[in-house]
Amino acid sequence: MKRLFAILIILVATAQITLASVRVEYVVPQPTSVQSGNGEFVISGKSCLVYSGAVRDAALYMLEYLPFKQILSSSKVMPGDVQLTINRFMAEEQYRLEVTKDNICITGGSYAGVFNGVQTLMQLMPVEVYKKSAKFPISVPCCVIEDSPKFGYRGFMLDVARTWIDASRVKRYIDLMAHLKLNKLHFHLTDDEGWRIEIKSHPELATIGGFRGGDSPVFPRYAKFDERWGGYYTQEELKDIVAYAAQRNIEVIPEIDMPGHSKALGAICRDILCNYTPNTSATNGLDIRNVWCAAKSSNYALIEDIIREMSQIFTSDYIHIGGDEVDMSQWKKCPDCQRLMAEHNLENEKQIEDYFIARVTEILARYGKQPAVWNEAIEGGLLPKTTRVHGWESTKKCLASTAKDYPTIVMPGEFFYFDMKQSASEPGHNWAAIFDSRKVLSFDFAKAGFTAEHMKSVAGIEASFFSEIFIAHNPETNEYLDYMLFPRLCALSEVAWSRNKRSWEQFSAAMNKAHFSRMDAMGVTYRLEPPKVTYASGVLAASVSDGSILYYTDERTGKSVKYNKPITTTEPHNYSFESRRGTGKSKTTGSTEYFATLKPAVTVTTSIPCSSRTPITNAAKYGNSIVRTTRAAKSGDWIEYRFEKPLKCREIYAQTGHIHLRRCHFLAGYVEVSYDGENFTRVAELTDGGAAVVSDKAIYALRIVATSRSDAENQVVIQSLKIK
């Protein structure tokens, strides 16, 4: 009996080890070459982590995830050990991971290559590794993986200027990048909405410019309009972020966006702006200029102070200096900038930007740095070919940059701007495209028009997240940002790393069978594909294809329960569905009837003058047509919707501002309705510029009334009503 019990213990232990291993075909991103072997290697409590060469930091990194009792600097390896070593004859980020029954050996061309191998090894282990709670023994399948990246620049741009994200959370996203072998963090530190970097010679830039709203001279935008909100990174915090990223093979490339996108700086350093008095009649007296004057020598002295201190913080050879979306009308109105044009024989204001960036480039060179810019900045034709260009506007702009032999980071918004909606009914922008991870994975250089000659100037690929909308989605938590990034960032890693392009089916299999579970362990609130919902013959049915669990909600009660079988109903519009799995979830969706809206004939009028390009009649067209006024709102302004026939409906949602963004809207106000066409009753208060109205009576007219000025824009956006 004792012998039988001992055998059972051995069998159970073996079963546990077998369950721990992960199939090599589910590594994300897909390696270049994989040879599966027979058997497995077991890391035990007696295994030693042995390293040779300058990879001690990689060994220490592994200790954060794996409970090795001993790490050792040695070229000698004993059976049962895990070895990290460098082979200088390999390419810098190349690695070889060999797992035999006796040992694991990761060999890289440099620290970067070894670290890449570590990430692959971790993906062959149980997901508990990512919880930092794994215990030995751990089994790893025998294999030989030889791998190297397609591009040396595999980046992600994080905008912390528009929505503040503290240092600990930035480190979290650095960790998530590292797990996907992404190696460049483009750190968008300044914009119209905030200045996030401490400059000790000019402390007010951060201590004042890092906050908006309340008593700050930086006017609030996008949300949190009634409080002083924000933050900034001290230089010590930034140095810590840089070091933390470096251990994870990630280079931090800071961005100071100029000469445009500088409204926050202009609000606290008025002298950087052009030498004229702006007309503020359309903005309730607010000066909303956001462009550095290119003619003031004092501006270049300030820029030098900033760059001097940045060069002591950031180890990257590059500092991104912006160059996008510059409102050059401010230079046209500035006598000093016009005089500059004449003195330097500049043909147009675009060449003023060239002049400005050339001056900043000279400053960068004095501190051993090179410039990176957005693609608009090269349109003047005068920037040196060493300038690195980030092509964001379109693939055509990326092609144009590479055709001019600029080293180009390919990041067209329609594929790689992860602040875009993932479907029509989800949050996010839609100006570039509406897309999910399938489209990200589909990016193909050849199909986009890149020839072999173009590819010589492609330095890499980058995704970005601009954070205007994040501030309206509980920005103190990671849920919204996670949902927007994952699994799109996983798909980006495939495009940036893998030479052997995965099909959508192969990618989905890797996610469903392995990587979603890894992200569960990482605590990532990732997006799942939404359920497919159908309604026919009184039966409402839903299904998923990724193994997630379906739930439905009865909108009348708000109760959410697990979906087990089709629902018989004559009111499909009352039911919504979502899928859940681990820490992931899908968007809320429903049948066609759930999304159906009414579009009754309506006449719209307003007390605010409207642009002839977007007349008030647009608000009666429904859909995505909008109206732009020619000034901001004042207290007492109104927008009225008068129906051709009295309207009976379930709900009316009245919204000012952009459809997807809390901007250009009434900061405070209310909605009133008329049940007789003459007298109005106040029925709802505005929240973020909008309000829902529910009535059991027929409504003749609805009016949105402002009780304060609108936000810090020179217009109000008027939408059509959303009626159910």
Predicted regions and their residues:
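Flexible, acidic glycine-rich loops studded with aromatic residues
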Residues: 371-376, 383-387, 393-545
